Amino acid sequence: MKRSEKAAVIEAIKAKADKASFAVLTDFKGMTVEELTNLRGSLRKAGGEYLVVKNTLARIALTDGTHDVIKDKFRENIGVAFGFDDPVAVAKALSDFAKQSKLFELRCASLDGKALEVAQIDALAKLPGREQLLGHLLGTMNAVPTNFVSLFANVLRGLLYALKGIEEQKSNAA
């Protein structure tokens, strides 16, 4: 690989790393191209991307960036998964894939500049996703006006029954 090609690869990795809030190092030794393609597809759906790069180029690209804390972990066959939107979705996709494939291993991760171990990645994968949390938040926010309307309707219903009772008393008295 020529020096200019190396510089282009470093810049591409650096650009992706700067955009990503989450980076996971994985061991992919012995995996087939088809398995890696399936992994890339599931990560794409989760808002992530998977790269297989030379370790020295990745170390250079991650130096002085958000994911600087994991740059020294590049050894042997390491792939990098970047998460751009929802780290939980990417962690779930990687964790699920690791359970399916005996050859695929999670090594470590960086979340907003903080190093994570495998157990922490698995814990992150068990959290509810962004969509679930937003749905729960909207449900909670919707509960207050719904309860208010229900309470107001009950008060009005009670008032109507009271007025109806008074009307019946007056019609019986007359």
UniProtKB/Swiss-Prot annotation:
Coiled coil: none
Keywords, sorted A to Z: Ribonucleoprotein, Ribosomal protein, RNA-binding, rRNA-binding
Biological process annotations from GO: translation
Gene Ontology CC entries for this record: large ribosomal subunit
Lyase among keywords: no
GO MF annotation list: large ribosomal subunit rRNA binding; structural constituent of ribosome
Keyword rRNA-binding: yes
Recorded superkingdom: Bacteria
Function: Forms part of the ribosomal stalk, playing a central role in the interaction of the ribosome with GTP-bound translation factors.
Stored NCBIfam families: PRK00099.1-1
HAMAP family listed in its UniProt record: Ribosomal_uL10
UniProt similarity note: Belongs to the universal ribosomal protein uL10 family.
SUBUNIT field: Part of the ribosomal stalk of the 50S ribosomal subunit. The N-terminus interacts with L11 and the large rRNA to form the base of the stalk. The C-terminus forms an elongated spine to which L12 dimers bind in a sequential fashion forming a multimeric L10(L12)X complex.
Protein's recorded name: Large ribosomal subunit protein uL10
Native organism: Desulfovibrio desulfuricans (strain ATCC 27774 / DSM 6949 / MB)
Gene this chain is encoded by: rplJ
